[in-house]
Design a protein with these regions (language model features):
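Active-site-proximal cap/lid insertion segments
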Residues: 1-133, 140-150
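C-terminal cap/loop subdomain of S1 sulfatases and analogous C-terminal strand-loop tails that border
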Residues: 89-93, 133-136, 143-187
């Protein structure tokens, strides 16, 4: 347990789509017959099973996250703790998603929960284009540290926050293959 009244930083790395669903009973698992396979993939049983497993993995991780949030509440930390959930890449279940700078590879979950002082407008959904650099600027602000003006990120909750017109991304290698790709994403 955490010491009472002291600030803390914790990082919990979940395995995401890199593992089998751990905590779902058979009756909780997704029926492959009920999933939608993206149009650019073969519409067959193999891909339906892959997509169903991915759905189950997400639900399995949801349970783990729920347990973490419940523990924070039980310890009286729910109203004083900021929780940030994000991924380092998009979907991991199909070819071209994880390692390619495409919409499927770049669109990541990004959720923040915390006290209103730091995370205003509880339950708000924003569709702004953001960069992981923005998370750096935001967390420095939460810690009371002024971030350098040269940093390319911005505090997502600042009064003067300006939505980005575009975000850039890239890939330099995939495993042992050098393959430099750059992208620009706009609305």
């Amino acid at each position: 347990r955490l010491p009472k009244g002291k600030p803390f930083f914790g990082q919990i790395q979940l395995k995401g789509g890199k593992t089998k669903p751990r905590n779902l009973s058979d009756n909780e698992k997704t029926d492959p017959a009920n999933v939608t396979v993206p149009a650019d993939y073969p519409q067959n049983d193999l891909y339906r099973r892959v997509v169903a497993k991915h759905c189950d993995t997400i639900r399995s991780e949801d349970k783990v996250i729920g347990a973490i949030l419940a523990a924070l509440k039980e310890d009286g930390l729910e109203e004083t703790t900021i929780v940030v959930y994000f991924s380092d890449h998009g979907a991991n279940n199909l070819v071209r998603h994880k390692q390619q700078p495409t919409e499927a590879g770049l669109h990541v979950p990004f959720m923040i929960r915390g006290p209103e002082k730091w995370v205003p407008k509880k339950g708000q959904v924003r569709n702004d284009l953001v960069s992981i650099l923005d998370l750096s600027a935001t967390t420095l602000t939460w810690a009371g540290i002024e971030y350098p003006k040269w940093i390319e990120g911005q505090n997502l909750f600042a009064k003067d926050f300006k939505p980005r017109e575009f975000v850039g991304s890239g890939r330099d290698r995939c495993d042992h293959t050098i393959d430099r790709i750059r992208t620009v994403r706009t609305e």
